[in-house]
Amino acid sequence: MHTQVLFEHPLNEKMRTWLRIEFLIQQLSINLPIADHAGALHFFRNISDLLDVFERGEVRTELLKELERQQRKLQAWVEVPGVDQDRIEALRQQLKSAGSVLISAPRIGQQLREDRLIALVRQRLSIPGGCCSFDLPTLHIWLHLQQAQRDAQIESWLASLNPLTQALTLVLDLIRNSAPFRKQTSLNGFYQDNGDDADLLRLMLTLDSQLYPQISGHKSRFAIRFMPLDSENGLVPERLDFELACC
């Protein structure tokens, strides 16, 4: 059985921001519990990147709009015969609940911005080697605390992101499942089509091909060019089958 590789590409700025936030939040949990300097720097660098993303746009506002939009889309399915009404209602309640929690939550990332340790580490991250023990004695002593003490602090930091994480996960799941994968064929490594107001492209390639897609475009139209991983000796077949979902 061929191994399939999934690629996702945003077709607008809000989706680009959401995918970056999702990626960074996932990265925060990868190396837990934090037991050494390398794990700590990975964690704090992702916290810093996440706060930078928060400062660039109205994340909460866009998410609340999307939660409402998804509720309207579900409402349109209520009158369709054969639809699982219980499932529709359960999803609507989840969307409503996530919106209520998000709108009543403090400013996204505020607890992280106000934390002294996070602020100190953020100041040094842009300096090559700037997180040595003599630069950041606060981090050095923090890493020598009892593991349970560090774990509790990290748990508190991550919990402050829960309103965002829950809403974002729900929205992205609905968007990703809004369109099925369909078989498509590229000619000489190129494929283009209309976006039909899609937010996200999802593309499946077999690993055997050792190709990757370069995607450009927006919600109205997009183009995909397939490139060989080995730029010197790799070949792109004249016809390449792949699976594509426009979500």
UniProtKB/Swiss-Prot annotation:
Name it: Cell division protein ZapD
Q: Which organism is it from?
A: Salmonella typhimurium (strain LT2 / SGSC1412 / ATCC 700720)
The UniProt entry's GO CC annotations, sorted and at most eight, read: cell division site; cytoplasm
Record note on quaternary structure: Interacts with FtsZ.
**What are the GO BP annotations of this UniProt entry?**
division septum assembly; FtsZ-dependent cytokinesis
UniProtKB keywords:
Cell cycle, Cell division, Cytoplasm, Septation
From the Swiss-Prot or TrEMBL record, state where the protein is found: Cytoplasm
**Protein origin, superkingdom:** Bacteria
Q: Does the keyword Cytoplasm apply?
A: yes
Name the family the entry cites. Belongs to the ZapD family.
* Function summary: Cell division factor that enhances FtsZ-ring assembly. Directly interacts with FtsZ and promotes bundling of FtsZ protofilaments, with a reduction in FtsZ GTPase activity.
Question: Which spans are transmembrane here?
Answer: none
Matching entries from Pfam families are given as:
ZapD (PF07072)
